[in-house]
């Protein structure tokens, strides 16, 4: 899906749409800064599916663009790990992507 479509479905607020939009952003978005900011915005979600998608999408952004604001990403991931210890595996995978590709 393109940028405008992703924005539209994120605005819907429907869980499955938000999840699909975030993953699409991670895999397709050409604007790295916007993609990173959007993923990080959804780190505030209390919905585990949305949060997992935002974390995974951030890893995709790092892998695809080979660049990321690491300090902000690391701090945000640590905060999420504190709130949702059950997501430690997903967070570890994303940290691996950030370390390997940026």
What is the predicted role of each segment?
Residues 13-14, 46-48, 83-85:
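Short inter-helical turns and helix N-cap capping residues of alpha-solenoid HEAT/ARM repeat scaffolds
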Residues 19-23, 55, 92:
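Hydrophobic core positions within HEAT/HEAT-like alpha-solenoid repeats
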Residues 74, 78-102:
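Eukaryotic acidic, Ser/Thr-rich intrinsically disordered low-complexity regions
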Residues 26, 59-60, 96-99:
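Structural signature of alpha-helical solenoid repeat scaffolds
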Residues 1-9, 30-43, 66-81:
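Amphipathic alpha-helical scaffolding segments comprising HEAT/armadillo-like alpha-solenoid repeats
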Residues 31, 63-64, 100-101:
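Alpha-solenoid helical repeat scaffolds
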Residues 49-75:
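Mid-chain, well-packed structural core segment of small domains
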């Amino acid at each position: 899906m393109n940028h405008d479509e992703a924005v539209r479905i994120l605005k819907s607020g429907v869980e499955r749409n938000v999840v699909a939009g975030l993953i699409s952003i991670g895999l397709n978005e050409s604007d790295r800064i916007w993609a990173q900011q959007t993923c990080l915005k959804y780190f505030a979600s209390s919905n585990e599916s949305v949060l997992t998608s935002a974390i995974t999408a951030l890893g995709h952004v790092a892998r695809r663009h080979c660049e990321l604001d690491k300090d902000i990403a690391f701090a945000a991931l640590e905060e999420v790990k504190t709130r949702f210890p059950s997501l430690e595996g997903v967070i570890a995978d994303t940290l691996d992507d950030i370390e390997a590709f940026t």
